[in-house]
Amino acid sequence: MKRFFNEACDINTPDKSGVNENKLCFPPLKVVCQAPETTVKGQVANTNKHNVYSTKNSMYLLGFEEILNTVLDCEPHIFTDDELRVIENFKALDSDERYLFVRLFMRKRNKWFRVGHLTYPDCKDVIACCKQLVLKNFFEDESLMSTEEIIEILSLDELRSLARQTKVCGKSRSEISKEIIFLSKRQSVLHCNGQQFLSFDAFGVMHKQESFLRKQLLYQCKSCVKPKKILVDLFHRINIVYFRSSIYDEQSLTSLILARLNKFSYPNYVLSRTSNVFNCRAQCLEYVEVLELSKNLVPIFENTAASDKEALEQALNSFFEIYPIWSTYLNEDIREFWVEENRKVDTRLVRFSFSFRPGAVYTYLIHKSLNILAKSRLVEVEHEILDTLLSQNIYLVGKRGHWYNRKALLEYNFKTEDTNVLRYWKTLALSTCENGIEDKYTHLRYYFSLQRRLVRLRKCLKVSNTTELKSMKLINNNPSRLFLHGERIHNGDLSNRTVWRSKTNNAITVEELALQHYQSIGWEGIHAESSILLTLFALTFWDILFEDVPGVFQSPFQSAPLDLHTDSFYISRESTIMKRLEEIRNGKAGLIIKDNYIREHQRKTFCVGLNWSYTCEMLLEIVDCINDNGLAQIFLALTQDYKNSSSGIPDLCLWNPSKKKFMFSEVKSDNDRLSEAQKFWISLLISSEVDVEVCHVSMHKKK
């Protein structure tokens, strides 16, 4: 199935067998949710509903049309009359023509396709369909291709053949392409015998070499087509509206098709497709535009090195370009948000709808640009931006703890020779830490760093601890450490994964080597990383995950609410989450897990993070060994920031049923260091009185 999907969609999909990915899946139309039908004799009947006998019932076409119909039914106000006519024209196409358009639309954007290389068995006549789609203005043909675009789609063998004909030097694709493009700009024509001469048309006008070369290039590649950009943009916008995308993702439709290739059973929840996420067409266009902008800018803001002065300057220019736009959107959105709040509208729906405003994406870009300001050492600008971000609480409220922490660091490190000014800034840093710890939106993952900084500042300023802050629990975050030695195998693998020799002389990973040691001293365990905790979380919070919250279930095929990876998940369900955490502290987690497991296991219901390969007995055994308060704290971190807290969980999950003991172990080989996410989890586990240790594995010392 994976191979078929890769070939169909031209993407490289890594093998994700095992744990479900933390992403939503939306297949279209019907999905078989019941057990297989049986014949009279009790034999399993043929339940394959996905056999494609023509393009009319193709899963690609049916899924695409389901998206179109849903968006047009719910949100027609975001399209112009011309756009609606285009969509109607698309619906009027022959089924083979619609099918071919959808298949090429799903492939790489702005790519030319050689008609002779398109092989779709379900389509009766691909060549005829391409011609019709060109005539009906859905495709562009090779007449609009540039020389560079033609060269790009030719194979290396074809380029080498052309190079021999035109006496062009070069062996690699880049060398030959460069020489051909250079040659095309010359006015003299080079014929196959290597002789150069000037060429004139019937009217005595001199030809350029480019015209001659284009003919040769087009002779090699034959007919080519690609979907028109204006149509691709329109249908991608419809995709974004349908999937309620908060990131720019051109593969949403392919995810939908992948889900349709399987017979998934989805959880029961109340479907609430909203029609007012985008108030008007202009807002939708602005949102899609800034999503595409973020796709380009986020990698620049994240990856630009401080040593690359030119790239850093370009990144700064991008920041200063978007800053005034962000400021305008932010001020407008704050005013409108509070107007909506005062209208007694459901706050949960207000927060959900505001996450699809251009201001939400611009705020995310500004948050990412803090990295560039730090590398550029623009301390005053960064400090001002942090103040502005903290002055609002409608966008990225889950990042407030990070902003407090960074702001306190800038204030603590303020450089001056004046001791009074220095004390002022350190006092300001102290106040920032206190505000951060007291802020109800500060997540657990930021508490520990704020607490440690607060202690250092109090000591530096010689301030007495007169009033204890809420939730203030200072902890020693140094885990116990175990040192093991083993024999490392040099397997020539270029990856960073180390390979070790087991007791039975097999090649194993460093985690498996550590697990063998723990099992030898009485522990049961698995190398699970986040898998066990995410499975326990899904089963414990099932009813809360699929609670009827306005706007978060917009498709009948979701494995999680749309807001799970956002700040809104915790805010919109705070009361029910806190009630569930109290039940967990009172020892009821096992009963909740057992009830949900028994109810959903037969259908293998598709839920985010849930791995049905674990038995109910094993999960209950693990829960019975973890202290109830520790389990509640672990789940609190996941409810506050599921996306980021899903990473960094220690490698090994270990338990001893007879002694009712549980422990996590993070395994490190030589020169491997703890990441920030791993440090957070270790701090959280220690503060929650859940045993955790770091297991260092190194090679045997040579005698």
Curated annotation (Swiss-Prot):
Its cofactor is Mn(2+); Mg(2+). Mn(2+) 2 binds at residues 529, 651. One of its GO terms (cellular component) is nucleus. GO terms for biological process: double-strand break repair via homologous recombination; interstrand cross-link repair; recombinational interstrand cross-link repair. It comes from the Eukaryota. Belongs to the FAN1 family. This is Fanconi-associated nuclease 1 homolog.
